[in-house]
Amino acid sequence: MADDVSEFLGQNPETAAWLELVHGECESDKLWRYRKEFILRNLSDVCGEAEVPPPPETNHKALDRLLAYSMVWANHVFTGCRYPLPVMEKVLKMAENIKVTDAPTHTTRDELVAKVKKRGISSSNEGVEEEPCKKQKSSDHGERESSYIEDTISDGNVPSTSLNKREARLSAAQRTDVNTEFYDKSSNRRSLPVSNAKSRLNLPEEAGYKHGATQGRKSHSDIRHQTSMKGPAQSSDNALKPTRRFTTEHTKERQPFFNRLYKTVAWKLVSAGGFNANLNHEELLNTCIESLKATLEVSFVPLTDLADLPQNKTSQENTVCELRCKSVYLGMGCGKTMETAKAVASREAVKLFLKKKVVVRICKRKFNGRDVEDLVLVDEEFRPVNLPPAIKNPQEIV
């Protein structure tokens, strides 16, 4: 057909000159070749068989409509755009004799969701340079996978009541100048002698906790006991602070935004050819959020400083990344570098948008050994168990 078009334009130089006026500046040669054929096949319905089309600036309504239909058809064939059914039927009928041999294939959002649902979502770290940590299998209820830690939380967490009892034992040990026993979060105990009442205990850091020791006593009535917990560990005073409770109002005011974000990410995935390991999930997620005038909130912390982790799963070189938007938790990831951790977290967040629907819910998460409420983006079939521990106190973020 390309030869027929060239022959026709050679015989009609005025029509050829007019076509160059409607040739888009950024239009590729391949797209223009087929759109030009579309215009020529339907030009006689607008201008007659032998008439030369009027210049584009004359605002000829029928001609403008033809040019618009040509762009609709080209966008549908080469970029996968969809339009209302009457428009699609019209342009497909106008192009029924045009054979496009090298058009790309496109996957609709519904086809993509159906395909992913059929084969299931793998929780492996494919596409990331290193595999962060071992993971447990996903449950049958569609529970969100965590790519950097095991879902189960260590039984060695020290609750606030245990901290109070420990302080009492330490204080009593000072009065009697006997050995003091120190308990870390993994329930390993070690005896530390208190040889001098004015000396200061230097306790090593384990599993992200640094315990400062008591300072000396001057007299029986002037005993002072100070315990400092640095990094992510909480003090006994913080444990006694009242817990803020989220309400349905917090979820309702954020849900409309994530409904729009769901549609934006879904169409972005369709245009990118679907969810795959080679996709830049970080860029995709950030672009979609910024298009809705929002910001992707990124937090990093060394894995060893994150509370509620089994001690044998920590690594000195690993970094944890947590993603939020509108103060709502999206996902977590772990890697040897910040870039890798963010890439893993972004991929886990994008997986959410492959589901039929995403909702903002109030879920329980661990923070410094205690349960706190957090706003979490999940799919509608999610069961709120085994969520990874929080990097920051969720109730101080909102």
Curated annotation (Swiss-Prot):
What keywords is this UniProt entry annotated with? Answer: Nucleus
Q: Does the keyword Nucleotide-binding apply?
A: no
Q: Which Pfam families match?
A: XTBD
Cell location: Nucleus, Nucleoplasm
One GO cellular component term? nucleoplasm
The primary site where this protein sits is nucleus
- Skewed-composition ranges (Basic and acidic residues): 131-147
Residues in XRN2-binding (XTBD) domain copies: 19-124
Q: Has UniProt tagged this entry with the keyword Secreted?
A: no
Q: Where is this region: Disordered?
A: 118-245
Q: Where is the composition biased (Polar residues)?
A: 154-163, 189-199, 226-238
Q: Which InterPro entries match?
A: XTBD
The similarity comment for this entry is:
Belongs to the CARF family.
* Function comment: May regulate DNA damage response and cell proliferation.
Name the chain's protein.
Protein CDKN2AIP homolog A
